[in-house]
Amino acid sequence: MRLLVNNKKAKYNYELLDKYEAGISLSGNEVKSLALHHGKLDDSYVIIRKNEAYLLNLLIPKYKFDTSKVLNETRTRKLLLHKSEILKIDLIKKQHSLVIIPYQIYFVNNKIKVSIYLARPKKRYDKRQTIKEREINKKIRKY
């Protein structure tokens, strides 16, 4: 597994619950751009429409050696999941009022995969608690 892009804000803003791995439909130039570690997952999210999963707001900048037509850098991209997985994710999401966020994009056996999580947004006091715990752990490691 070779990590390409990571969502740095995910652990701070969300409580991550269930993990799923999905393929992603990309053009060749987008793959080349991601292979150079260009991309941003910070504001992206997953929606389920008509029993298909889509990744929105994933920023993949234009590959610098690309001479073809310009695609929208934040276009909607289809996620490749089994229908049973999509139905299961959608059911859990609706029952527990969760969101689906992408956490990482990585290579596995020359295929680009996206790890998505069912997550619960953190409240402001939860974020403060996370910061306090992190500072305490730093002090403990220091001594």
Swiss-Prot record:
Keywords on record: Cytoplasm, RNA-binding
A Pfam family recorded for this sequence: SmpB
Biological processes per GO annotation: trans-translation
Alphabetical list of CDD domains matching this protein: SmpB (cd09294)
Domain of life: Bacteria
GO cellular component, one term: cytosol
Subcellular location: Cytoplasm
Xref: InterPro entries: SmpB, SsrA-bd_prot, SsrA-bd_prot_CS
GO molecular function: RNA binding
Homology family: Belongs to the SmpB family.
Biological function: Required for rescue of stalled ribosomes mediated by trans-translation. Binds to transfer-messenger RNA (tmRNA), required for stable association of tmRNA with ribosomes. tmRNA and SmpB together mimic tRNA shape, replacing the anticodon stem-loop with SmpB. tmRNA is encoded by the ssrA gene; the 2 termini fold to resemble tRNA(Ala) and it encodes a 'tag peptide', a short internal open reading frame. During trans-translation Ala-aminoacylated tmRNA acts like a tRNA, entering the A-site of stalled ribosomes, displacing the stalled mRNA.
Name under which the protein is recorded: SsrA-binding protein
Organism: Mycoplasmoides gallisepticum (strain R(low / passage 15 / clone 2)) (Mycoplasma gallisepticum)
Higher taxonomy: Bacteria, Bacillati, Mycoplasmatota, Mycoplasmoidales, Mycoplasmoidaceae
